[in-house]
Amino acid sequence: MLKEGGLRVAVIDADRIAQGVSGHTTAKITSQHHLIYHYLLNKFGQDNAQIYAHANQRALSQMRSWITAKNIDCDFTEASAYIFAESEADVDALRQEVDAAQALNLPASFTTETELPFPIKGAVCFTDQAQFHPRKYLLALAREIDGDGCHIFENTRALSVSEQSRCTVHTATGAAISARDVIIASHFPITDIGPFSARLTPKRHYAIGVVVDEKPVENMYISAEEPIHSIRTYETDTENILLVMGESHRTGEVIHTETHYQRLIDYAQSHFGARDVRYRWSSQDLQSVDKVPYIGRFSPTSRHQYTATGFRAWGITHATVAASILADLIQGKDSPWHKLYTPARIKPVTSAKEFVKHNIHAAKHLIRDRLKKREEGVESLTPGEGKLIKVNNQNVAAYKDENGNVFTVSATCTHLGCIVSWNSAEKSWDCSCHGSRFAPDGTVIHSPAVKPLKKV
């Protein structure tokens, strides 16, 4: 959007384009974001709820238009999006959601009939939604950016951003990029040392791709009940693949993460008769304390730094919403959606409970985890195991690989100093406070940390 507006743009990525979270989603292009609209009407009022609904419906239309106009081959298909309930206890919530969505002019209806191969008590149906292959789509857009004075720099990690009359992005290579405006779209803003730390919760989500004999569904589904399961299908040249995502938890809260994959496999087998597991992966996203993303100027004092974060696992349409809002602001235009999404908003009644809960949690990990008793030495480590130990009264993250090599690094996250914990399935050190993740040798996998864990 900025390039089309005549601006020169540079995109920098610590890894490769579409290698991270955006390339590993279930890729539903929909304004149906689970049970959200009844909540928005109650907490934000009619006008703001209407903004959320319209913005995401408009994002769906915009993406459909881009894919058609640019002839992007990304397996785009039209589909309906359903929230379903297997329990009678959740039906009232579904009916409330339908009423709210219809009041906001969304294409919603209640039904008791779906193509799911198991009985349900009811479902919310949004028609005229879509699904696609996110990586194919993102790489096509990236090709549109590069050229005519615009650039993409991959494998370039930003360390910090300074702002005066212009902004300077400082990178890990020592190079610096000067720009009038900078958008920090690193999930958790890498430059934040204050407001976002208290208002964003990192969540991990798990996904599997399993083989099914026949394609069980044409549309997209998500369960109303906890644990939430998100469902869609994908066809290869030779197989029908059922994608199931769910079993979410706060980052760094679970050590034996392998159990979450097994629960997804059990669900796919019991509900769909799934066979072999072809793919498995995990992803991460952030949730704001009031469930609405933060999109706009980084802080009230920032003139040229912007951010987009807190998508609550609904980043496909919200990324396009963010692009529209930020393109308008940077070009000096009014954005009709900004008043809802602005990071400067204050909704004390809406978010107070989650705000307190989040910050008690962070404080617990910042203080209590430092004082825990831990065994000393690495003698008890088995191959493939990671464990927190004490060395000279310091918390150390120790890992033994399959060849018996031991890696020891500081257990103190380089972002804001919380203690990391071991993730057995991904073999990583994860920070529960703000979502940073590190490889066994301390290398940064996921921001907001930009520096590795110190070697010990």
List the predicted regions and their residue ranges.
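Glycine-rich FAD pyrophosphate-binding loop
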Residues: 3-24
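Glycine-rich active-site loop/strand segments that organize a redox cofactor
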Residues: 24-55
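Flavin (FAD/FMN) cofactor-binding and adjacent substrate-gating region
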Residues: 35-41, 65-140
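A non-catalytic, amphipathic alpha-helix used as a structural packing/dimerization or gating element
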Residues: 51-65, 96, 263, 267
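Helical element adjacent to the flavin cofactor pocket in flavoenzyme catalytic cores
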Residues: 92-93, 99-104, 123-181
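Flavin-dependent oxidoreductases
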Residues: 160-234, 373-379
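Rieske [2Fe-2S] iron-sulfur-binding domain
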Residues: 208, 388-456
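C-terminal catalytic lobe of FAD-dependent flavoproteins
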Residues: 225-226, 250-355, 409
